[in-house]
From Swiss-Prot:
The gene is frr. The keyword Protein transport does not apply. InterPro entries: Ribosome_recyc_fac (IPR002661), Ribosome_recyc_fac_dom (IPR023584), RRF_sf (IPR036191). CDD domains: RRF. This is Ribosome-recycling factor. It comes from the Bacteria. GO terms for cellular component: cytoplasm. The keyword Protein biosynthesis applies. GO terms for molecular function: ribosomal large subunit binding.
Amino acid sequence: MSLIDQAKEQMAKTVENTKENFSGIRTGRANPALLNGITVDYYGAPTPIKAVASIGVPEPRTLSVTPFDASQAGAVEKALRNSDLGISPNRDGNVIRLTMPELTEDRRKEYVKLAKGKAEDGKVAVRNIRRKTKETIDKAVKDGEMGEDEGDRLLKDLDKVTKSVTDEIDTLLETKQKEIMEV
């Protein structure tokens, strides 16, 4: 695997990580990914909520959480209540409903700022991958393992890959901003 392919692979992982980070940012709509970081005390063991309940979106602003084990509905509700989502769960038998409140303009701007920060974190990670790969190429040229022309060609390829990945992160950010600001 060439150095450029390795860098591409690492950068692709960074883009996926950035997408994951974006999925945790609230928009005006219900999104099951909002519950990804929540763990339930399931018979004494902290367990991800996805492993103990099914999560659905019956309406655009409502999430429904149905525990697989009905006796654990209380534990799931407690985990949702104690989470940092800022949403109060409503229990209806074994089904727990989370209704997303309308976001205020100030809140939307905060979330846009948060999204920009996560996008910048992704870009910094991409630049770090580029820097490490560039150092490896420069060292190989200096040690005579490859010619200067090949080193220059690899650096140009690396710059193209880096630009396309940062553009992809910018596109993801634009999409997320539109989602957040949509009323």
